[in-house]
Regions:
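Beta-barrel outer-membrane channel/assembly domains of diderm bacteria
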Residues: 21-114, 121-146, 152, 159-162, ...
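Exposed, low-structure sequence patches enriched in small/polar residues
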Residues: 45-47, 200-204, 219-492
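Alpha-helix capping and helix-loop boundary segments enriched in small/acidic/polar residues
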Residues: 119, 162-166, 198-199, 235
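Bacterial N-terminal signal peptides
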Residues: 9-17
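Short acidic, glycine/serine/threonine-rich loops at helix termini
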Residues: 110-112, 155-156, 197-198, 269-270
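Short glycine-enriched, charge-decorated loop/helix-capping segments at active-site entrances
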Residues: 114-117, 474
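Outer-membrane beta-barrel transmembrane domain signature of Gram-negative proteins
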Residues: 119, 187-207, 212
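Bacterial N-terminal signal peptides that target proteins for export
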Residues: 1-10
Length: 492
């Protein structure tokens, strides 16, 4: 058995040799972070993530390194993590054969969706092999086989959400074609063989298809997916169905998007992580259970009646099929006015009501106005942002719900493209032990220094309020933070 360090040295040596070869192009990005907590033990958090792409003729490759190191003592789920990923692909014009780590989404994600989200620190990837063929009539065929790995940052630590199911096998195929300029369709099949399935014939399948059409300024899209699984423990067929419909219309200066979705026992597995992540109509990214039992719709309208004025309105609603006590409604109006090239004003108002979405919260309503202003003066940039959130919260065991306010303000000054300074403050006018550990004020100071065009250093000192945050239907609760965060992003 060759030690891991020896294998890594061999790979690095091989990479150095390849770099010297003519015709090889290399590019990538490295993000290094260090957190220091102002707590009783002065805990620290070190993280580094590097992604490198290599290309030599028809050969492609990627190299990914991830390191997470929390300071001791390691308690519960807080453990260090080391990940090493690679991809090797042969990619002529009409064909690609890939082995290693990859991301793949079929359609809108009703059958399969994987992705990488650095801002939300969520990395859901496949590891295996994939073949892609590009055929006439704008036709693409994808076949894959591999295993899922879902890495997510929550409770101030990285976790592999599917750590008990990393050996489950995923196989799938997808066909998409557009035989006519105005019409296209597709079909897909995904099969998951789980280690914990009660019998060899007990597996989960996703079978679906989609159609799209365009006429003038109008585009319509529809996707249907059926899940065929096995009831856990007792066996027997477990079926689910979901569909997604959308339509867009756009003319000069105006656009309208409408979408409708219905997911009934489609999300799999039912809790924790999912192989599929269907769209949510909620702009802020909130979902109930990511396709297990959801139904909703959303509408977005934009307008530019005059050149300096931009208007946008969004409305989304999501609820369960037979449960009136669970759901979310969100609407937002936004306007942006730029009287000149140096000055921009933006105002928006967001309203959201959540019922039984957050843990231990029966209902939470927010009304949040926000104002932003940006002014360019020579080489200087001045930006001001202020918001004031009116919150009503009910834990389900209260005679009178809580009513409190969450203000926030920040002022930024930038000089040229090299330096940006920001001072900010967040607060709450009520002591909330469960949500904010009884804290009520979070000041901070941040400096962003563009050392070169390819290297950016960001240092933040102070505190962050945290709270419930979502992206693409995946949500987490971020605890308040006090300390120092330093981040260096390097591109090469």
């Amino acid at each position: 058995m060759i030690p891991r360090a020896v294998r890594l040295c061999f790979l690095v040596s091989a990479f150095v040799s390849l770099v010297s070869a003519a015709g090889l192009t290399v590019q990538g990005v490295n993000r290094a972070e260090f957190w220091a907590f102002f707590d009783s033990v002065y805990a620290t958090h070190t993280e580094d993530k590097m992604d490198m792409d290599l290309r030599y003729g028809d050969l492609n490759g990627t190299l990914g390194l991830f390191m997470y190191e929390p300071s001791r003592p390691w308690v519960g789920l807080q453990q260090p993590m080391r990940l090493f990923d690679y991809t090797v692909a042969y990619s002529p014009k009409q064909l690609e054969i890939l082995y290693g780590k990859f991301f793949q989404t079929f359609g809108k994600g009703l059958a399969l969706r994987t992705y990488s989200d650095d801002d939300f620190r969520h990395y859901k990837s496949m590891n295996g092999c994939r073949g892609t063929a590009h055929l006439p009539l704008s036709t693409e065929v994808v076949a894959l086989a591999g295993r899922l790995r879902d890495v997510f940052f929550q409770e101030n630590t990285y976790q592999v959400l599917n750590r008990t199911d990393t050996t489950d096998q995923v196989m799938g195929a997808d066909l998409s074609t557009q035989p006519l300029e105005w019409f296209g369709f597709g079909g897909r099949y995904v099969r998951v063989n789980g280690q914990n399935d009660p019998a060899p014939k007990a597996f989960t399948e996703f079978v679906g298809g989609n159609m799209s059409a365009a006429y003038g300024p109008v585009d319509v899209y529809g996707e249907l997916c059926q899940r065929l699984g096995t009831k856990p423990g007792i066996g027997g067929r477990d079926k689910g169905l979901g569909y997604y419909l959308s339509g867009t219309a756009a003319v000069s200066g105006y656009s309208l998007l409408a979408e409708y979705m219905d997911y009934d026992t489609l999300g799999y597995p039912a809790a924790g992580y999912h192989y599929n992540d269907p769209p949510t109509p909620i702009k802020s990214g909130v979902a109930i259970d990511r396709g297990v039992d959801e139904k909703g719709f959303g509408v977005t309208a934009t307008a530019t009646p005059t050149n300096p004025l931009y208007l946008e309105a969004d409305y989304g609603r999501l609820y369960r099929h037979k449960d009136n006590l669970t759901g979310v409604v969100e609407w937002e109006g936004k306007s942006r006015f730029s009287p000149g090239t140096d000055l921009t004003f933006e105002a928006k108002f967001n309203h959201m009501v959540q019922q039984n979405i957050e843990l231990h919260v029966a209902g939470r309503g927010t009304n949040k106005p926000t104002l932003q202003a940006n002014y360019l003066l020579g080489q200087s940039t001045i930006a001001l942002e202020a918001e004031y959130d009116f919150v009503t919260e009910d834990t389900g065991r209260m005679v009178v719900p809580w009513k409190y306010h969450e203000p926030a303000v920040s002022l930024s000054y930038g000089y040229g493209a090299a330096l940006l300074f920001t001072v900010g403050w967040q607060g709450v006018d009520m002591k909330l032990d469960r949500r904010y550990n009884g804290e009520q004020s979070w000041p901070m100071f941040e400096t962003v220094w563009s050392i070169t065009e390819r290297n950016v250093l960001r240092v933040r000192i102070g505190a962050e309020r945290g709270g419930y945050t979502c992206s693409g239907g995946v949500c987490r609760f971020e605890s308040p933070f006090k300390g120092v965060k330093a981040q260096l992003i390097s591109r090469f």
